């Protein structure tokens, strides 16, 4: 019997990355509230958020293996989520200009009573950015559905001076470690 894998995410980037594994899956969007816990560390928060997404979907599909993830950008004690508007995106990108920040992605996989979570953290350093670069980037519309207001897999890559860690963690799903974890759930393509 083929086991059903569900991706508890509407992120097109997570879908593209999961497609690389060539494991059949379906998508069910989680209705879990994405609220950070004040006294949690960034790592604890990102794992907790991923688990909340998974548990919300697993309640509806108790016989499936459910995979969920959440990504946060963390800089100077602040969480940088998806921007509310162009002004918020400009504020975030100006803050990250010429600086190094952390991107953390938490992953949760649940099968019945078994629930495994992990996170990966990557440091991203930006070049110093000019106001006109930031404005032009915001005008593309790319920042608006991304934590930290940039997509490393798109035009936002032009701002990146270097990364330390897994590139796919920044995109939204550390795919290599995710594949290895799915293997422990007996889900793999090779």
UniProtKB/Swiss-Prot annotation:
Role description: Nucleoside triphosphate pyrophosphatase that hydrolyzes dTTP and UTP. May have a dual role in cell division arrest and in preventing the incorporation of modified nucleotides into cellular nucleic acids.
Source species: Bacillus licheniformis (strain ATCC 14580 / DSM 13 / JCM 2505 / CCUG 7422 / NBRC 12200 / NCIMB 9375 / NCTC 10341 / NRRL NRS-1264 / Gibson 46)
Site features described as Important for substrate specificity, chain residue numbers: 13, 71, 153
Keywords, ordered alphabetically: Cytoplasm, Hydrolase, Nucleotide metabolism
Protein name: dTTP/UTP pyrophosphatase
Family to which the UniProt record says this protein belongs: Belongs to the Maf family. YhdE subfamily.
Molecular-function GO terms, alphabetical: dTTP diphosphatase activity; UTP diphosphatase activity
Cofactor: a divalent metal cation
GO BP term, pick one: nucleotide metabolic process
Record SUPFAM superfamilies: ITPase-like (SSF52972)
CDD domains the UniProt entry points to: Maf
Subcellular location: Cytoplasm
Top-level taxonomy: Bacteria, Bacillati, Bacillota, Bacilli, Bacillales
EC number from the UniProt entry: 3.6.1.9
Gene Ontology CC annotation, any one: cytoplasm
Reaction catalyzed: dTTP + H2O = dTMP + diphosphate + H(+); UTP + H2O = UMP + diphosphate + H(+)
Active-site residues, Swiss-Prot/TrEMBL: 70
């Amino acid at each position: 019997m083929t086991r059903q894998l569900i991706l508890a995410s509407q992120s097109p980037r997570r879908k593209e990355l999961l497609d690389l594994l060539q494991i059949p899956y379906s998508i069910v969007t989680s209705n879990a509230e994405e609220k950070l816990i004040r006294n949690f560390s960034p790592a604890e928060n990102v794992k907790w958020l991923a688990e909340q997404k998974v548990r919300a979907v697993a309640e509806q599909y108790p016989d499936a293996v459910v995979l969920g993830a959440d990504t946060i950008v963390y800089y100077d004690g602040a969480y940088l989520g998806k921007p509310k508007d162009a002004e918020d995106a400009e504020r975030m990108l100006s803050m990250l200009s010429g600086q190094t920040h952390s991107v953390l992605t938490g992953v949760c996989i649940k099968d019945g009573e078994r629930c495994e979570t992990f996170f990966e953290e990557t440091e991203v350093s930006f070049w110093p950015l000019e106001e006109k670069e930031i404005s032009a980037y915001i005008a593309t519309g790319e920042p608006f559905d991304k934590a930290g207001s940039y997509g490393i897999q798109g035009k936002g890559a032009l701002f990146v001076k270097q990364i330390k860690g897994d590139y796919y963690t920044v995109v939204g799903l550390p795919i290599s470690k995710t594949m290895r974890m799915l293997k422990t759930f007996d889900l793999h393509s090779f």
